[in-house]
């Protein structure tokens, strides 16, 4: 030690290099440390491969031991579960069977009645067509303000009853208007076009009270005519002046203008 204290730093470095063993390098030292220090943890996780590997490597550097992952004794839940038994045949849930035979489609016979009087109600239609068979629906079409459109739907449970009612009542007047009855043959709802009202003047209607009288247009026209005739008869007709009388009036007017 006393010799090294008197030596310079460069001489000490040269001496240390000359005394170092030839077979030992930096890698070997690290390998030994890696085998001893990291061998314990590697043995607990991966089966004790870290210590032996570090010593055998020598100058090759440390070798990291990787844990071996096993699934022993750990049951993981499946991401999804399949049904035990799948149906042999796929079937749409909106249809019962067959193509185009939906459960929501209507059956039976449906009539479209048009050219109805605006006073015909749902009860009148039901009472009129109920004698031919069981009705599913019988209703008059109304607009948003509650006025009748002059058309109605009559839906029978059986198509034969609808045909019988159409043959019996097609063209028959109801409250003075002949009913126009058509059989709706497609599932598409028939286009509802309100028929223009016929002229009420000059016709005789049958009120539901049983009395027969003129329509409102005739009554209004009659009152207007009476008032017109009364006012015309009370006035005196204008007297027509002759040419001589007109000349005399003109001369009198001119004379008054001259004097003024």
Swiss-Prot record:
Domain (RRM) ranges: 109-186
Any one GO biological process: mRNA transport
PROSITE patterns linked to this entry: RRM
Keyword Chaperone appears in the UniProt entry: yes
GO cellular component assignments: cytoplasm; nuclear speck; nucleus
Chain intervals for the UniProt region annotation (Disordered): 1-89, 189-260
Main subcellular localisation: nucleus
Biased composition, class Gly residues, residue ranges: 24-62
Entries under SMART domains matching the protein: FoP_duplication, RRM
Start-end of Basic and acidic residues biased regions: 1-14
Keyword hit for Transport: yes
Stretches with biased composition (Basic residues): 220-232
GO MF terms, alphabetically ordered: C5-methylcytidine-containing RNA reader activity; RNA binding
Subcellular location: Nucleus; Nucleus speckle; Cytoplasm
Family the entry assigns: Belongs to the ALYREF family.
Its job: Functions as an mRNA export adapter; component of the transcription/export (TREX) complex which is thought to couple mRNA transcription, processing and nuclear export, and specifically associates with spliced mRNA and not with unspliced pre-mRNA. TREX is recruited to spliced mRNAs by a transcription-independent mechanism, binds to mRNA upstream of the exon-junction complex (EJC) and is recruited in a splicing- and cap-dependent manner to a region near the 5' end of the mRNA where it functions in mRNA export to the cytoplasm via the TAP/NXF1 pathway.
Protein name in UniProt: THO complex subunit 4
Organism, as annotated: Xenopus tropicalis (Western clawed frog)
Lineage, broadest ranks: Eukaryota, Metazoa, Chordata, Craniata, Vertebrata
Gene that encodes the chain: alyref
């Amino acid at each position: 030690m006393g010799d090294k204290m008197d030596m310079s730093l460069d001489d000490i470095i040269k001496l240390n290099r000359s005394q170092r063993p030839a077979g030992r390098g930096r890698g070997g030292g690290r390998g030994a440390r890696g085998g001893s220090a990291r061998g314990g943890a590697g043995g607990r996780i991966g089966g004790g491969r870290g210590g032996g590997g570090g010593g055998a490597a020598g100058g090759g550097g440390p070798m990291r031991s990787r844990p071996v992952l096993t699934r022993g004794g750990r049951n993981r839940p499946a991401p999804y579960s399949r049904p035990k038994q799948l149906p042999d045949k796929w079937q749409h849930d909106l249809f019962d069977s067959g193509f185009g035979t939906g459960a929501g489609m209507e059956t039976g016979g449906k009539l479209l009645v048009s050219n109805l009087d605006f006073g015909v109600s749902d009860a009148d239609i039901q009472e009129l067509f109920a004698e031919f068979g069981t009705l599913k629906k019988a209703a008059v079409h109304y607009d948003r303000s509650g006025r009748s459109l002059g058309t109605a739907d009559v839906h029978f449970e059986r198509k034969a009853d609808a045909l019988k009612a159409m043959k019996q009542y097609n063209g028959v007047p109801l409250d003075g208007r002949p009913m126009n009855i058509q059989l709706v043959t497609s599932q598409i709802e028939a286009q509802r076009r309100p028929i223009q009202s016929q002229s009420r003047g000059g016709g005789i209607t049958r009120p539901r009270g049983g009395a027969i009288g003129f329509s409102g247009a005739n009554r209004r026209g009659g009152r207007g005519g009476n008032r017109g005739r009364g006012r015309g008869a009370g006035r005196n007709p204008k007297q027509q002046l002759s040419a001589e009388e007109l000349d005399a009036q003109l001369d009198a007017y001119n004379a008054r203008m001259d004097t003024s």
